[in-house]
Amino acid sequence: MQRNLVVLLFLGMVALSSCGFREKHFQRFVKYAVPESTLRTVLQTVVHKVGKTQFGCSAYQGYCDDHCQDIEKKEGFCHGFKCKCGIPMGF
């Protein structure tokens, strides 16, 4: 039952995030919808981590460059799931 609830909440968050809702909205929803327990802590951590990732980075090659040009006027580089502006990948 808990697994179904987690999957349902996650899919709902993904759907709502495409409508412009931000991490703070989801954190507030999890706080009121899920009773205080380990499950709530795990969900809040997942919401935070998903909120910090930029999935467009790995799916669309020009995403980071567009993102960094908009905010810092620098060249963008994809580091895993995060964009770094002006910091090339170093191996």
Curated annotation (Swiss-Prot):
GO biological process entries: defense response to bacterium; killing of cells of another organism
Question: Annotated Gene Ontology MF terms?
Answer: potassium channel regulator activity; toxin activity
Superkingdom field: Eukaryota
Question: Does the record carry Cytoplasm as a key word?
Answer: no
Q: Check the record and name the InterPro entries matching this protein.
A: Long_scorpion_toxin_alpha/beta
Which cysteines are disulphide-bonded?
Answer: C57-C78, C64-C83, C68-C85
- Name by which UniProt lists this protein: Potassium channel toxin MeuTXK-beta-2
Record's keyword annotation contains Acetylation? no
Its keywords, alphabetically, are: Antibiotic, Antimicrobial, Cytolysis, Disulfide bond, Hemolysis, Ion channel impairing toxin, Potassium channel impairing toxin, Secreted, Signal, Toxin
Q: In which tissues is it expressed?
A: Expressed by the venom gland.
Q: Where in the cell is it found?
A: Secreted
Family recorded in the similarity comment = Belongs to the long chain scorpion toxin family. Class 1 subfamily.
Domain BetaSPN-type CS-alpha/beta per the UniProt entry, residue ranges: 54-91
Where is the signal peptide, in residue numbers? Answer: 1-19
